[in-house]
A protein has these predicted regions:
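Long, contiguous internal "core" modules enriched in hydrophobic/ aromatic residues
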Residues: 15-17, 24-44, 133-332, 345
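Central hydrophobic cores of alpha-helical transmembrane segments in multi-pass inner-membrane proteins
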Residues: 3-11, 71-89, 108, 159-162
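Membrane-helix interface/capping segments
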Residues: 77, 81-96, 264-271
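Core segments of transmembrane alpha-helices
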Residues: 332-340
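Transmembrane alpha-helix boundary signature
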Residues: 43-47, 115-127
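Central hydrophobic cores of alpha-helical transmembrane segments
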Residues: 354-364
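N-terminal signal-anchor module of multipass membrane proteins
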Residues: 1-77
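Flexible loop linkers connecting adjacent transmembrane helices
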Residues: 53, 86-100, 124-133
């Protein structure tokens, strides 16, 4: 990337803004069909009841909440990766920073759908928000679920500002190469950016401020998500390790999702000179670190249960490894901790195919981790 000029990079990126090909519209059509199928399934659930989604007693939190935690983790990791690497002046973050931040904004929107879908009476969702109403009903602000609403709304606001601030020079570059209606749109979006020295000075300070603000905010917000479980009395959930455990898992899954998204786009848009193999290597090395941290969290959970001599806790973790959902537990450990260790070998982390496959495996594993926590945590009765 050091051999590229800024003009060449701009032109490479701008080349992707040409009118889309037929294959693009086919993909859009397929995604639209998928969305319509999902809407039809949701309408069926509203008509019949949420039991069709697998919610039952004792597993009242099913796949909807699994998906919620998974996508919130992806959302938090994008900004966290970009912000932390910016604070540490890691230059290799630049080619993937915008993608990670964009992934964050859209993942928050996806995550927000699942509590809404999970509601039996979705048309009364406004009761979840502190809005004045004639029935004088107010949310319970002591509930972790209300913590979620406030924390994620705050996070969406800050991450969107962080993302948009970083985009300003890019939007101006598109504006300068556009004509007609596109020029007018990007002129508004670029907020008068001209690239003057004074603008760059304010830009770098503002971007640094948002990075410094976003880093602790992301950690605190995902800790709040973990409190949905940790503040309950369910064995396996009621533990103080959940906050760092969830944050580490979010970064782990987010790094894997960056690889999952960047590798196909790198090939499709011919970004090989910008998103170099060295950049992908660094992401893979970081996945090794986060995978070891997640593995440490798995072991620490068992150690805490054993050391506490709490028979119910010990039974919960024994059942996790030997009970009905033991396959999910071992699949989780394999995908999240053991397989990422293959990135230790240079041949593995410099081969595009293995990078992509292992990133998919980590994403599957992180989804199953949430399954093991949410479903496995309440499926075992203690009566």
């Amino acid at each position: 990337m050091s051999q590229l000029t800024y003009a060449k990079i701009d032109q490479t990126i701008l080349d992707t803004l040409t009118p889309p090909k037929k294959s693009y519209w086919i993909l859009v059509f397929l995604l639209l069909v998928g969305a319509l199928i999902g809407a039809a399934c949701w309408a069926y659930q509203i008509a019949v009841g949420i039991g069709v989604g697998g919610q039952n007693n004792p597993v009242a939190w099913g796949t909807y909440l699994i998906n919620f935690v998974f996508w919130v983790g992806i959302a938090h990791s994008g900004t966290l990766i970009s912000a932390i690497l910016h604070l540490f002046r890691a230059g290799w973050r630049n080619p993937i920073a915008r993608a990670a931040e964009t992934m964050t904004v859209f993942a928050v929107c996806v995550a927000g759908l699942f509590p809404f879908i999970h509601l039996g009476r979705a048309w009364q969702v406004y009761y979840m928000f502190p809005l004045p109403n004639q029935r004088l009903l107010w949310p319970n602000f002591l509930s972790p679920l209300m913590f979620d609403v406030i924390a994620i709304s705050t996070y969406l606001t800050v991450s969107s500002l962080f993302w948009y601030t970083g985009l300003l020079p890019d939007l101006a570059a598109v504006r300068d190469k556009s004509t007609g209606t596109r020029y007018k749109i990007f002129k508004i979006l670029s907020l008068g950016w001209t690239g003057a020295h004074e603008q760059w000075r304010h830009y770098t300070r503002g971007y640094l401020f948002f990075a410094a603000l976003a880093t602790p905010l992301v950690i605190s917000v995902h800790s709040v998500v973990s409190w949905d479980f940790a503040l309950g009395i369910v064995p396996g959930w009621h533990t103080t390790i959940f906050a760092p455990y969830f944050v580490a898992g979010a970064i782990h899954s987010g790094l894997a999702m960056v690889l999952t998204l960047m590798i196909p786009l790198r090939k499709l848009f011919k970004y090989e000179d910008i998103i170099t193999i060295e950049v992908l290597q660094n992401v893979a090395k970081t996945i090794v670190l986060t995978g070891l941290i997640v593995g440490l969290a798995y072991g620490t959970e068992y150690f805490i249960a054993w050391y506490s001599h709490n028979t119910i806790e010990m039974e919960q973790f024994r059942w996790r490894a030997l009970g009905d959902y033991r396959w999910g537990f071992y699949f989780m450990v394999l995908c999240n901790t053991l397989i990422p260790l293959l990135f230790v070998f240079k041949k593995v982390r410099t081969t595009i195919a293995t990078l992509f496959i292992i990133s998919l495996i980590v994403n599957f594993g992180m989804w199953w981790e949430r399954f093991v926590i949410i479903v496995g945590g309440v499926a075992h009765g203690f009566a």
